[in-house]
Structures are given as structure tokens and as C-alpha cells.
């Protein structure tokens, strides 16, 4: 596994723990179809949450939410429609979140959770 893949997996693990600690139930991780992948699908109360996770090892690449705009956000919405087609009876409320996981050089980890990011 490449360094970038390990960093991404680390970030998704941290994000899933963060969501669980916040009271969410993780329904799927790395859900795939032919059109792409959704990092995390969770249920938080009556809300179904589709999560994109961006992991950064520094500030060189900007913030996570800044990376999920335009085509990327539209692709995640399309993937959510596919997920919903395969999983009937979703909750009435659907939300798209971006979780940014920052792994600092000194080993500390910070999570920024932007609810309803797009």
C-alpha cells in the first residue's frame, strides 16, 4: 500500500470514529459502484449522511471542503442517488458532509467536520 493510500485509510478510520463518537451509526465504508466510491455513509438520528473524507498531512493542499466543489460534489451526489436506489426506505433528511482529517508532523490529529458542506 502506497503512502498516500495509508494516509487516506488512516483519515477514513479517524473520520469514522469521529462520526461514531458524535452518535452516528456507520452504514457503509468505501461503498463502490462502477461510477465511483463514497467514503462513508452514516445515519445520524433521522438523517442519512454521505461523507467525503479528505486527509491532509499539512496545509500544502488547502482545506478538505475546498477540494469538494463543482464536479467532485456533483459526482458524490450522483453516487448517493445510486446508493439510495440500492437501499430503499431512506430517512427523509439527506445531508452531504466533508470531514477533513489533519495529521500534524508532531503526531497530533485534528478533525474538521463540515456538516451540509454541499
UniProtKB/Swiss-Prot annotation:
InterPro entries: Restrct_endonuc-II-like (IPR011335), tRNA_endonuc-like_dom_sf (IPR011856), UPF0102_YraN-like (IPR003509). Transmembrane segments: none annotated. GO terms for molecular function: nucleic acid binding. SUPFAM superfamilies: Restriction endonuclease-like (SSF52980). It holds the Pfam family UPF0102. HAMAP family: UPF0102. Belongs to the UPF0102 family. PANTHER family: UPF0102 PROTEIN YRAN. This is UPF0102 protein Franean1_1156. It comes from Parafrankia sp. (strain EAN1pec).
Amino acid at each position: 500500500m502506497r503512502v498516500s493510500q495509508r494516509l487516506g485509510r488512516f483519515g477514513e478510520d479517524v473520520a469514522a470514529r469521529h462520526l461514531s463518537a458524535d452518535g452516528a451509526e456507520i452504514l457503509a465504508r468505501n461503498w463502490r459502484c462502477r461510477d465511483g466510491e463514497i467514503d462513508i455513509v452514516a445515519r445520524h438520528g433521522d438523517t442519512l449522511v454521505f461523507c467525503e473524507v479528505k486527509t491532509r498531512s499539512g496545509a500544502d493542499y488547502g482545506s478538505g471542503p475546498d477540494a469538494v466543489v463543482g464536479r467532485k460534489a456533483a459526482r458524490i451526489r450522483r453516487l448517493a442517488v445510486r446508493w439510495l436506489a440500492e437501499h430503499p426506505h431512506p430517512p427523509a433528511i439527506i445531508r452531504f458532509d466533508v470531514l477533513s482529517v489533519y495529521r500534524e508532523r508532531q503526531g497530533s490529529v485534528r478533525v474538521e467536520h463540515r456538516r451540509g458542506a454541499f
